[in-house]
């Protein structure tokens, strides 16, 4: 298992596969599988039968994609970037965009 550099709420772009170029926010992270669910990406329609708990019908939902197929969006330029970890003067560890040096995520706000 690899160290994940993604968190819920991060802005990412798909860099490979059928959904290449689509942007979205991370809705859920599955660290044990190294997969994430991104809003508006890998959307499928599922046909469900009616039962006592719910009605039947067609529902749309996002399926997980592997983290190797996504890249963070640089907050400064808006382009895909790699992520590094950096320690600030106060000793806190933050995620930084390698291209611009901007802090990524809630730590930067």
UniProtKB/Swiss-Prot annotation:
GO BP terms, alphabetized: translation
Sequence similarity: Belongs to the universal ribosomal protein uL24 family.
UniProt cross-references to Gene3D superfamilies, sorted A to Z: 2.30.30.30
Molecular function terms from GO: rRNA binding; structural constituent of ribosome
Any Gene Ontology CC annotation: ribosome
Disulphide linkage map: none
Full protein name: Large ribosomal subunit protein uL24
HAMAP family on file: Ribosomal_uL24_B
């Amino acid at each position: 298992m690899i160290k994940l550099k993604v968190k819920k709420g991060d802005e990412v772009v798909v860099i490979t596969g059928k959904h290449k170029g689509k942007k979205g926010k991370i809705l859920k992270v599955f660290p044990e599988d190294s997969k994430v669910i991104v809003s508006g990406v890998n959307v499928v329609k599922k046909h469900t039968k009616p039962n006592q708990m719910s009605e039947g019908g067609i529902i749309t939902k996002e399926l997980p994609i592997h983290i190797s197929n996504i890249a963070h969006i640089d907050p400064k330029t808006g382009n895909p970037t790699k992520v590094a970890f950096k320690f600030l003067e106060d000793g806190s560890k933050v995620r930084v965009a390698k291209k611009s040096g901007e802090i990524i995520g809630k730590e930067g706000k």
